[in-house]
């Protein structure tokens, strides 16, 4: 999302009640999975003077280094605004993709040695596309990448975003080489489509993408349906207003369709950044529909959007990071046509949850922030039976504060000062 340079700011492992476009777990995460040993944090140097880096945090509860940063991998770029990584670790032997938004760079890391990952290469977007954002791993190991922009002017008169053309998608091989690409341009949308995130339905040769901005002034509030086999754009669906149970419309509730997930019945459920929830059905036909099925009331945020960010799905539960409410909200999506809120967990008002990832070997969830709180990450625990979430108070920084702190001067790579973290993944 739109972010200040210093306060930055798919495919998840989902239990049996919900399907997913996620790849299988890494080969070294066995069916009798144990809690992850490490956490990878994609971090930026706060003052932008030193290199951004991938940090390795020891998260073994019985380790003398529990909660400590044990390794860092500088990427040789400062001020890149480290943003998204893949949402699930790739299979063993494959490289982990991560993006640095400001420099339009995608970094590929070898993570075979869990404690000592290494940067293998850095790649630029394939012309004419600009600003890579999200990644979705295919079964063959290739990676789909969404691009927010393309070369040229915005199709919207008066939009000064430059370059400002419609975004697009590309398929890259395991090494980051271009296989194919396609534009998200649609004559039905005069507002630029900013490809944000993916939901994959390979069994019916379909995928869905959302549209949301980072630093762009304008972005179409639409979702798009594609044929996976040839990247043919089939439909562009406007996102309808977000309504509360009494029928009243939440202003901006439909804004910035954000993160989609495939449900067990084949439908796609997605949250808008404005905290409306939408179900897309009929992807396999020419009669696909999108309906507002739930809305989290974030009107206390005023005219700003509620900042519903990255979800995780645990069985029948959708756990939603809601930045403006400083909360994790759990929805029961066993019936995706009728989500029901079951619990809320509050953080302090300075921490605005945005990113989440689940440890496939335990009930731990790492929670990162956006637009407030990026100087730390918090650990949460989920009850898979009830969907209730609690804070893990065993993980504390050197000053005793809960979570992992990036407020420090020394790192394994040197005395470079404070950092911020955005994305994180558990490493078995």
Please report, for each region that a protein language model flagged, where it lies by residue.
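Surface-exposed loop and turn segments in beta-propeller and other repeat-based domains
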Residues: 69-83, 122-128, 180-194, 235-253, ...
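Blade-loop segments of beta-propeller domains
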Residues: 67-137
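Beta-propeller blade signature
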Residues: 55-59, 160-176, 220-230, 379-384
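Loop/turn-rich, solvent-exposed surfaces of beta-rich toroidal or solenoidal domains
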Residues: 302-384
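Short, conserved, GDST-rich strand-edge loop motifs in beta-rich repeat architectures
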Residues: 34, 41-48, 145-165, 209-222, ...
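Asp-box/WD-like beta-propeller blade repeats and closely related beta-sheet repeat scaffolds
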Residues: 111, 116-202
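Structural signature of eukaryotic scaffold interfaces centered on beta-propeller domains
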Residues: 27-35, 84-92, 135-139, 150, ...
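Beta-propeller domains
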Residues: 191-328
């Amino acid at each position: 999302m739109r972010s200040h340079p210093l306060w930055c700011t798919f495919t998840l492992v989902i239990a049996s009640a919900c399907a997913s476009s996620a790849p299988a777990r890494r080969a070294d995460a066995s069916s009798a999975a144990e809690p992850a040993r490490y956490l990878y944090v994609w971090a930026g140097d706060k003052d932008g003077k030193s290199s951004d880096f991938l940090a390795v945090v020891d998260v073994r509860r019985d380790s003398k280094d529990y909660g400590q940063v044990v390794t860092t991998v500088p990427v040789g770029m400062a001020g890149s605004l480290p943003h998204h990584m893949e949402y699930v670790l790739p299979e063993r032997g494959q490289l982990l993709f991560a993006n640095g938004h400001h420099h339009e760079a995608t970094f590929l890391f070898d993570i075979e040695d869990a404690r000592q990952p290494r940067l293998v290469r850095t790649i630029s977007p394939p012309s004419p596309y600009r600003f890579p954002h999200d990644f979705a791993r295919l079964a063959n190991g290739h990676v789909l990448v969404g691009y927010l922009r393309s070369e040229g002017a915005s199709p919207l008169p008066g939009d000064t975003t430059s370059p400002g053309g419609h975004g697009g998608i590309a398929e890259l091989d395991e090494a980051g080489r271009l296989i194919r690409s396609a534009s998200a341009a649609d004559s039905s949308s005069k507002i630029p489509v900013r490809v944000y995130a993916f939901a994959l339905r390979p069994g019916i040769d379909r995928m869905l993408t959302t549209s949301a901005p980072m630093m762009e002034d304008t972005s179409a509030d639409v979702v798009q349906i594609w044929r996976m086999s040839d990247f043919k754009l089939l439909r562009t669906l406007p996102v309808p207003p977000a309504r509360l149970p009494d029928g009243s419309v939440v202003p901006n509730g439909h804004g910035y369709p954000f993160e989609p997930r495939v449900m067990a019945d084949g439908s796609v459920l997605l949250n808008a950044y404005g905290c409306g929830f939408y179900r897309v059905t009929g992807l396999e036909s020419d009669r696909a529909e999108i309906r507002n099925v739930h809305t989290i009331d974030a009107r206390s945020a005023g005219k700003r959007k509620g900042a519903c960010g990255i979800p995780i799905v645990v069985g029948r539960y959708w756990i939603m990071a809601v930045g403006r409410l400083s909360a994790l909200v759990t929805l029961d999506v066993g019936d995706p046509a009728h989500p029901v809120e079951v619990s809320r967990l509050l953080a302090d008002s300075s921490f605005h949850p945005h990113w989440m990832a689940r440890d496939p070997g335990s009930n731990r969830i790492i929670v990162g922030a956006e637009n407030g709180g990026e100087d730390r990450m918090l650990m949460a625990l989920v009850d898979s039976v009830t969907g209730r979430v609690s804070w893990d108070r065993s993980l504390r920084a050197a000053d005793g504060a809960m979570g992992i702190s990036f407020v420090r001067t020394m790192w394994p790579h040197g005395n470079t000062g404070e950092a911020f973290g955005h994305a994180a993944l558990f490493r078995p």
